[in-house]
Amino acid sequence: MYDYYTCQISGVKLDTPNGPYAEACHIQPVGKPHNGPDEVSNVLCLSPNMHVLFDLGAISINDDLTLIGIEGILNIRDEHDLSQEAIRYHRENIFIN
């Protein structure tokens, strides 16, 4: 999905003996109680460590794509149309300030 398995938060690309590895992370979690959509606009390509930190609410994203809880800005391609609604949901319901 994103730049050949490169983490959109850290920029890390994990290479394994079986090839590159990254994880698809839902911005607004799917299933109850969050009911996020299982769509590309609700997915980030993350390293395993960043995936866990994002899911646990240690990291989130501002509307301008700057990161919260870690310094930096989300790496994104023009064709990856992220859901601002999902980003806002994560920040307001998952992120722990």
Segments (PLM) and residue ranges:
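A detector for short metal-coordination/catalytic motifs
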Residues: 1-2, 12-97
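Acidic/histidine-rich
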Residues: 9
